[in-house]
């Protein structure tokens, strides 16, 4: 069963992280009115987090699913348990591409291994998936910053950028995808203003505005 956590929420906090034999997630269903972490201790906890959109965004869903496999194998690393965990997690969001990609990667890494080493290997592979997303976010930010610098040379006043949905750190394991260059530009001192379009079903624009507000990036929600 999911349990609340007293972990503080900071500007640089990850959306999920391992803590011992459990995983902490930022419960996005409570945002922007309440900031709280929830502890995932079982496969069922991870499945619920994905299904209920406590975690959302393709990269974050994939990483959470990977950790869900690790949570499942912590108590039973048999072939049957691995197959059950895979099926359970795939059913949470059948159309989520990163979910299936992450589970395919976990299966490929774990199925050939003896059961005695599977649990540790599952945690290692899940962490590798999280770290790969961190690196991808950083690379997107770096390359995007170069483009924004070029645009700034021919722009009078702040750069005007429009975003759709939420593609920031709430949707990933790092600084985000589409928002990563915006954060990099703001940190580099470029004048920038973001027009945040509202979307459904989870008011993702409001989540983007919440992110940008915490980072001090000028923005308008429309």
Language-model segments: residues:
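Glycine-rich phosphate/diphosphate-binding loop of Rossmann-like nucleotide-binding domains
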Residues: 171-221
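Acidic, glycine-rich active-site loops and adjacent beta-strand->loop/helix elements
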Residues: 67, 89, 167-169, 198-203
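C-terminal binding/interaction regions
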Residues: 4-21, 90, 94-160, 164
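Buried hydrophobic packing segments
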Residues: 65-73, 103-106, 144, 148, ...
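Internal active-site segments that recognize and position negatively charged phosphoryl groups
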Residues: 143-192
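Short coil/turn connectors at secondary-structure junctions
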Residues: 13, 19-22, 50, 56-58, ...
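Long amphipathic alpha-helical segments
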Residues: 14-116
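Glycine-rich oxoanion-binding loops at beta->alpha junctions
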Residues: 28-45, 137, 199-222
């Amino acid at each position: 069963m999911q349990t609340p956590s007293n972990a503080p929420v900071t500007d640089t906090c990850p959306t999920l992280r391992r803590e011992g034999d459990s995983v902490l997630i930022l419960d996005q269903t409570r945002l922007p009115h309440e900031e709280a972490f929830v502890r995932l201790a079982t496969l069922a906890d991870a499945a619920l987090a994905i299904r209920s959109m406590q975690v959302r965004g393709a990269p974050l869903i994939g990483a959470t699913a990977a950790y869900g496999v690790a949570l499942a194998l912590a108590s039973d690393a048999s072939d049957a348990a691995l197959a059950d965990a895979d099926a359970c997690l795939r059913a949470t969001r059948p159309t989520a591409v990163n979910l299936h990609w992450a589970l395919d990667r976990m299966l490929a890494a774990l199925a050939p291994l003896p059961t005695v080493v599977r649990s540790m290997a599952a945690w290692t592979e899940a962490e590798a998936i999280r770290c790969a997303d961190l690196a991808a976010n950083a690379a997107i930010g770096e390359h995007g910053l170069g483009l924004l610098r070029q645009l700034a040379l021919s722009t009078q006043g702040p750069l005007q950028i429009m975003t759709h949905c939420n593609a920031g750190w709430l949707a990933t394991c790092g600084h985000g995808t589409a928002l990563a260059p915006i954060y990099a530009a703001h940190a580099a001192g470029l004048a920038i203003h973001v027009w945040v379009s509202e979307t459904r079903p989870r008011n993702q624009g409001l989540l983007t505005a919440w992110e940008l507000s915490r980072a001090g990036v000028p923005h308008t929600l429309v």
